[in-house]
Amino acid sequence: MEEVKNTKLIGIGNEGIKKLEEVESKIVEKIDTEKININKDVDKDYVRALLDGVDILLLTYNSEDKQALQIVNAIGYMADERRVLSVGLDLSEKENKNEIKINREIKINNDNTDSSLNIIDMIIDSISDECTISIDLTDIKEGLASDKGIKYSYGEFDKNNSVEEIANKLEESAIKTSDELTGKKLMILVEMSSVYDIAYLNEVLNAIQDKSDDSYEAIFS
């Protein structure tokens, strides 16, 4: 299993930096942060130092800002060379039709910021040694690094929710990044207290898998 050394969140351009500052207090314990102004000279030596020891790279930016996008691509190109998983959090509401050099781009706005951060937080936990059942970083990369789209959802539930209700709500609230999906992995990340037993959890997992395509390889943390 690959050792996870570091996760870094970089705010690029005015809007990217503003979003980073907005969420920084929620993630600072687990993620290193960096702010890059569009006037910054982003040369190879700077990017190498930026990526040193990093396994997962998150970038916040507005894809309508062409200068910010150039910086994103410069960092993403070298991240790919170093086999760093790069995920862009694009603040623009418009579809980004420009060439992008990162592994995965997700639209982020005021409505989905908290849920997106929760998913990122759970991904980071899922590949850590402290996780009860961890996922290999290679599986995360394989699931996210593709030219095709992904579908993802997040929900918070308690024992008042039936197993079927949980599976249905997750399916109904799912967001697609494009119509054509990778069809590779079904990743189920669960955070729960000890009041829930393994049998109940197994029912939930089976219900979620029943809602998905049979061709998906399911992995769980």
Model-derived segments and spans:
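Tubulin/FtsZ superfamily GTPase core signature
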Residues: 1-221
